[in-house]
Regions:
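Extracellular jelly-roll beta-sandwich "head" domains, especially the C-terminal globular C1q domain
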Residues: 1-151
């Protein structure tokens, strides 16, 4: 098991990753992370030579809000695999005022083929309300990503 956290408030632009800086690393080297990065690498190391994959349960929990200089509206985060948001992991909230924090949780099982590596992250997937306005940035506080090897 590995755990990555970042407790202070951080501003995350649309399409960018949540930064993680405190690490409780995996002692076997299955999960890798560089501090002050939002990227975590899952390795497809197998203990049984007959196995074709390694499976991980990845869970993100954190508080998200629209920043004070933003406009209240729908915001979201999702787990991303190799830069692509996993839509089934998207956590969506709709604050009616700015700087109002909502707790969100997202979990996914990720299967890594033997000998491969996947890069995972937590991404701001908030979309623009109209085609002419940019997608909103979000504040993230108490970010916590837990990776557990399950098979």
């Amino acid at each position: 098991m590995a755990e990555f956290t970042y407790n202070p408030v951080q501003l995350v632009l649309a399409g960018q990753n949540v930064i993680l800086n405190t690490t409780i690393s995996c002692p076997k080297g299955y999960v890798l992370h560089r501090n002050e990065s939002g990227l975590v690498i899952l390795r497809g190391i197998v203990n049984n030579p007959q196995s074709c994959f390694a499976r991980y349960q990845v869970t993100f929990n954190g508080n998200i809000a629209v920043p004070e200089d933003g406009t209240a509206g729908e915001i979201s985060v999702a787990l991303a695999i190799d830069g692509e948001p996993l839509q089934t992991s998207k956590a969506i909230v709709t604050p009616t005022v700015v700087d109002a924090y909502f707790n969100v949780t997202s979990t996914a099982f990720i299967t890594v083929p033997k000998g491969c590596c996947f890069t995972i992250a937590v991404e701001n997937t908030s979309a623009s309300a109209t085609p002419t306005t940019p997608a909103p940035a979000i504040n993230v506080q108490n970010a916590n990503l837990v990776v557990e090897r399950v098979a």
